[in-house]
């Protein structure tokens, strides 16, 4: 298959950054307690919406942890990413676990999704952990979803909003830059992975709903790491296990409520194709 060639974009910058980190990505993040909590929350949300044997299109698949999980639950996953390094890690895992028949993958930009229509239609389009925050053209990306889905197909996205309560409170620790980085970010804010820089944009649930309202109906929004601290507050769960478990229980009760569903590090949003 001919490899797609993409012009230089911010998405390319992000892909280059994550390619540089791909070899150690799982080592860095695979054992983190709060990251494991986030994955469990997202996966539980998705599994409630999927019929057996669903056909999933995954965006920004990374090293393939979610692809392997959903394939292991009996679904077929077509995993995409623009990072060659991340796809290399996914390919290694697919071969190691003998999942060639249930996981396919290819390099694809968010803005090139329409060419995947012939490989669909899909029951679910899934994007985890803020991959879509790496594009300043989210409106165009969202506009490409409906033709890729079956009637009543689902979109589930995990996105960074414009306000995070925990992050804003870091101002009291003197971390002014981190505490304010989501503010005034209309033109994107600089992010760094290792020594590579790219821009990050923040989008509230209302933005997603507005851009999809013609073709989709909202299923629900839940806050993620809204009471539980973000995973970049290193060692929190290990240093304060009782507090962490208490906060987990509180988040489980509050994740669907206002304002908690809107003020987390992320939100999980699902919509159904009309």
Predicted region positions:
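Conserved class I S-adenosyl-L-methionine
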Residues: 2-51, 65, 69, 154-185
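A short acidic, Gly/Pro-enriched loop at the edge of an enzyme's catalytic core
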Residues: 115-125
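A short SAM/SAH-binding and catalytic strip from SAM-dependent methyltransferases
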Residues: 124-137
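A short glycine-rich, Lys/Arg-flanked "PGG" loop and its adjoining helix->strand segment in the class I
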Residues: 139-154
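A C-terminal cap/extension of S-adenosyl-L-methionine-dependent methyltransferases
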Residues: 210, 220-274
